[in-house]
Swiss-Prot record:
GO molecular function, one term: phospholipase A1 activity
DDHD domain mapped to chain residues: 669-868
Function description: Involved in vacuolar formation or function (e.g. formation of vacuolar membrane 'bulbs'). Required for amyloplast sedimentation in the endodermis during shoot gravitropism, which are thus acting as statoliths. Particularly important for the negative gravitropism leading to leaf movement observed in darkness.
Naturally occurring in which organism (per UniProt): Arabidopsis thaliana
EC top class, as a word: hydrolase
Effect of a null allele: Abnormal amyloplast sedimentation and shoot gravitropism. Abnormal gravitropism in both inflorescence stems and hypocotyls accompanied by misshapen seeds and seedlings, including leaf movement in darkness. Reduced formation of vacuolar membrane 'bulbs'. The sgr2-1 mutant has no gravitropic response in inflorescence stems but a reduced gravitropic response in hypocotyls.
Enzyme Commission designation: 3.1.1.-
Protein name: Phospholipase SGR2
UniProt KW Coiled coil keyword: yes
Subcellular localization, as worded in the UniProt entry: Vacuole membrane
Residue positions of the active site: S444
Chain coiled-coil ranges: 593-631
Tissue spec: Expressed in roots, hypocotyls, leaves, stems and floral buds, and, at low levels, in siliques.
């Protein structure tokens, strides 16, 4: 396999092969062997039996990200890092980083000391760096060149493949989104500073201590001014007078870090003999670990788990509105969702399922880097009153308006499609053998964008949704070119040049029909319908507007050519058709030859100007006549006069095709989508406004006279998840199957199991009413059947009735579409979260739309679906577990419903019908109590 390369400015350094960068289970054992057998590893092994000696090297990453253009060698600025300033990588991640480091140790150390020297040149460099740091926050956005550099970097994968480590720069950077660089530190020497934790020492001091250790400086001990019999080693660090003291023999040596009395010992906290040192990592021996230590331990365990279990399912998280705001961060939202799903999976899934598959959630940021030209104009028009509130609306609600605009819709669709393909190719580059599934999680507007992209994977070109509205008001107009023939979408910007040949083709429909597909894909005009307009005067109002725009555009273009003197003989070839057959100069133009054209340019320009003036006069006559006709037709007075009286329509030539025949060009995704999750989605109202139903195009009779357009997303399954109080969410099932309109959405199980008390009571009442109605219907059917048998003289009527019943049992078109979208005969699309027992609907509606990222019920529902095809154990059959309230593994303490003994301090304990054992026990006790005299 080809070696990967890491770009280091202008210099390239060969990296290890991709299989060496994977933290797979089979790779970890190999990494351990590589580390043990590596020649560079031998010098880091323990050479003594002292308690202060060890060989365990651990890698750390800084909690605070580096500033832009800040070198890693400049931090930390202390000789011992502070507590909680650096976090440890997991054991397996550290092994992978150390193995890669040892393979290129000499080169990496050389580059590191060179960078350290650049940081130590003097105060001049510090002033420049400070000036840069001051200028950086004033910039509106991060430089695009920085992102280009980030794209080229490939390092050692850590933390489940979401981050990578660049050993040359000592950076830890995110892989799938643009984020900050974090300082990476190699912990070989550690110090105990006032507590029980061993904190790492920066590499600059650690390397000096390592040289002293290999030389066994404790053998050259002498009496120090303090009276201590030790060997002193002066160190170069951030503190003046920094030195180390080594005492003891070979197997009992100890070391302390200290500074001279003239130094800043009071600032850095040196007391007595100094800070105790040790070589090699040692864990904490605190009997009561703090919350920070517990979180660190949990994160290390999760990183080790991610390095062992392969990714079998990839989920792209597409955000909705609001990501343009300063406080909005999709990466943090997806990070919270990832932590919640990991905790729920540990409690609700079996060990076999957890060890077989891992789900990777990757954020898809399509709005951060997207700059729309209309945003600047909106900012200029924004009033000063309640400025903050208006800015909040501009960062949230305006995204919906931009997407509904025919001008910016294409840019938004391109941003989402390109981002999805970019993320997938990034993942595939690092996992070339990936054969798992891929799903899309779309929140809010992101679900609408994802749906539109999935619906146009086979037909990549589609009219803008507003085009159907135009056809509704102008049914007699010829439809725009079919998407299959449209090679590219119509531009949303006015054209600066109008070619004479194109103008000639637009005025001659016969020439257009003889052209190739490229010519057919050009923008249609109403001039092609000249004959139809003559037969039906009522259509003049629709055609003359575009005619005016085209004629005015041609006139302006002629003026442009006249003033620039750019017209040549190629502009009007021999035998070319005249612009208008009634023009007085038509016969003259046909009789011209090349010599006369080249010699009489001025005369030809004059004739063209006369022709333009005559055309303008004819247009004015048509406008006046058309205005008289429109005054008699009341049906079109609400639409046509606004366009006829607007002179800007005549001058802005590109507005007509952009407003009425816009086309959206969709990019084909590089992957197949397994499941599409629409969460908190307004998709239902978008489809209703477009008059779209979900189908395969054969439901005309099913939808009767609704004249609906049908489309089907390219995915195996689709789910619509929403909170009942979310003001943005809408149902989807009524647009798929009419019979599902009275059906309630499926209740998503509570993450502790079952349904809440009020939900259970409500379902009990509805189920009781439904069953009672079915019983009554059954009695009515039996009575009708008995009466029919008694009244009939033969069994023919009975056979006919049975055939009629069989016909009634046939499934409808909508139910077939439900099965196509869900994968099961009785599947459902709409799934509703349970509201809390005591909460106000209107107060809950404020945060219901943004709470999906932190909702445990939503996370558990998605996790159960993604693991649905995995059996509970190696020999267990595969079962679907969606919405199942039964425990999956009775031998595990963390089952689906057994949650009473769990500790949930951060959440209220609601009343549910989930614990069947407690319910039975309570019923038994109640019966015993009632039996007592």
């Amino acid at each position: 396999m080809e070696d990967r390369e890491t770009h280091l400015g202008t210099r390239e350094v060969n990296e290890t092969s991709p299989d060496l960068l994977k933290n797979t289970p089979s790779n970890i054992a190999r990494l351990e062997d590589v580390i043990e057998q590596c020649h560079g590893r031998q010098k880091y092994l323990a050479q003594t039996r002292s308690p202060s000696d060890g060989s365990d090297v651990r890698w750390y990453f800084c909690k605070v990200p580096l500033a832009e253009n800040e070198l890693a060698a400049s931090v930390p600025r202390t000789d011992v890092v502070g507590k909680s300033e650096y976090f440890r990588f997991g054991m397996r991640d550290s092994l992978a980083i150390e193995a890669s480091f040892l393979q290129r140790e000499d080169e990496l150390l050389s580059l590191w000391w060179k960078e350290y020297a650049e940081c130590s040149e003097g105060p001049k460099l510090q002033v420049n760096s400070k000036k840069k740091s001051i200028e950086t926050p004033s910039e509106a956005s991060v430089s695009s060149s920085l992102y280009e550099v980030e794209e080229e970097r490939v390092g050692v994968p850590v933390k489940g493949g979401l981050y990578e480590v660049d050993l040359v720069r000592r950076h830890c950077f995110p892989v799938y989104w643009n984020g900050d660089n974090r300082r990476v530190l190699r912990g070989h020497w550690f110090a105990r500073k006032g507590g029980l934790d061993w904190l790492p020492i920066p590499e600059t001091v650690s390397e000096q201590l390592e040289v002293a250790y290999r030389n066994k400086v404790w053998r050259r001990r002498s009496f120090q001014p303090s009276g201590l019999f030790a060997a002193r080693i002066d160190l170069q660090g951030s503190s003046l007078g920094l030195h180390a003291l080594f005492t003891g023999e070979d197997d009992t040596w100890e070391a302390w870090l200290n500074v001279d009395p003239s130094g800043f010992s009071g600032i850095v906290g040196y007391t007595g003999n100094g800070i105790k040192l040790r070589r090699g990592y040692a864990g904490s021996y605190s009997p009561k670990p703090t919350q920070e230590e517990l979180r660190q331990q949990k994160e290390e365990e999760m990183d080790d788990y991610c390095s062992q279990v392969p990714v079998r399912h990839l989920v792209f998280m597409v955000h909705g509105i609001g990501q343009k705001g300063e406080k909005s961060n999709l990466v943090d939202d997806v990070g919270n969702f990832r932590q919640i799903t990991a905790a729920l999976a540990e409690r609700h899934l079996t060990s076999h399922q957890l060890s077989t598959q891992r789900v990777l959630f990757i954020p898809c940021q399509w709005r951060k880097g997207l700059k729309l030209s209309g945003e600047a104009a909106v900012d200029k028009c924004t009033l000063d009153g309640v400025r903050r509130f208006r800015e909040m609306l501009s960062a949230t609600v305006h995204d919906v308006l931009y997407y509904m605009s025919p001008i910016y819709c294409q840019a938004i669709i391109d941003s989402v499609s390109k981002q999805l393909n970019r993320l997938y190719l990034k993942f595939l580059k690092r996992n070339p053998d990936y054969v798992g599934k891929i799903s899309i999680y779309g929140h809010s507007l992101g679900s609408v964008l994802s749906y539109d992209i999935l619906c146009h994977q086979h037909n990549l070109s589609s009219p803008f949704p507003m085009d159907s509205v135009y056809k509704k008001f102008f049914p007699d107009e010829e439809s725009p070119p079919t998407p299959a023939k449209a090679d590219k979408p119509c531009s949303s910007h006015p054209s600066s040049n109008f070619e004479p040949e194109k103008s000639d083709q637009l005025n001659n429909p016969e020439k257009i029909t003889g052209q190739d597909n490229n010519t057919m894909a050009k923008e249609p005009t109403v001039l092609e319908h000249h004959d139809v307009i003559q037969e039906d005067p009522s259509l003049i109002s629709d055609s003359v507007v575009a005619n005016v725009g085209l004629e005015r555009r041609g006139g302006q273009e002629d003026d442009h050519h006249d003033s620039s003197g750019a017209i040549s003989s190629q502009d009007v070839p021999d035998g070319a058709d005249c612009r208008t057959p009634d023009s007085p100069s038509c016969s003259q133009e046909q009789s011209w030859d090349k010599e006369s054209v080249n010699s009489n340019n001025e005369e030809r320009i004059k004739l063209l100007q006369d022709e333009v003036n005559s055309l303008r006069s004819k247009v004015a006559q048509l406008l006046s006549e058309n205005a008289r006709i429109l005054s008699d037709e009341k049906a079109k007075t609400s639409v046509a006069p606004k366009e006829l009286n607007n002179e800007k329509v005549q001058t802005e030539d590109a507005d007509a095709p952009t407003s009425f025949t816009p086309f959206i060009k969709y990019q084909k995704l590089e992957f197949k989508v397994d499941t599409f999750f629409a969460v908190g989605s307004p998709l239902g109202v978008f489809l209703a406004l477009r008059n779209i139903r979900l189908g395969i195009g054969k439901g005309k009779d099913y939808w009767e006279e609704e004249n609906a357009i049908e489309e089907m997303p390219a995915c195996r399954r689709m789910f619509n998840i929403f909170h009942p109080y979310d003001p943005v969410a809408y149902r989807v099932e009524p647009l798929v199957c009419k019979e599902y309109l009275p059906e309630r959405p499926v209740i998503i199980p509570y993450h502790r199991g079952g349904k809440r008390l009020h939900i259970g009571l409500q379902d009990f009442r509805e189920d009781f009413a439904a069953r009672s109605q079915r019983i009554m219907n059954h009695f009515d059917s039996v009575r009708t059947r008995v009466l029919t048998i008694c009244q009939s003289k033969s069994a023919d009527n009975l056979d006919e009735m049975e055939e009629t019943d069989d016909e009634k049992d046939d499934r409808s078109y909508g139910s077939l579409m439900i099965e196509r979208l869900t994968g099961t005969r009785d599947g459902r699309i709409d799934h509703m979260l349970q509201e809390k027992t005591f909460e106000h609907p209107y107060l809950q509606a404020i945060g219901a739309h943004t709470n999906y990222w932190r909702d445990q019920d939503t996370a558990l529902f998605i996790i159960k679906h993604l693991y649905r095809e995995l059996p509970d154990g190696p020999n267990s059959p595969t079962e679907s577990t969606e919405g199942d309230d039964s425990p999956k593994d009775s031998s595990r303490p963390h089952s689906w419903i057994d949650r009473r003994e769990a500790d949930y301090d951060d959440e209220e304990l609601p009343l549910t019908f989930s614990d069947k054992q407690i319910t039975r026990s309570f019923s038994a006790e109640a019966k015993k109590y009632l039996k007592k005299p």
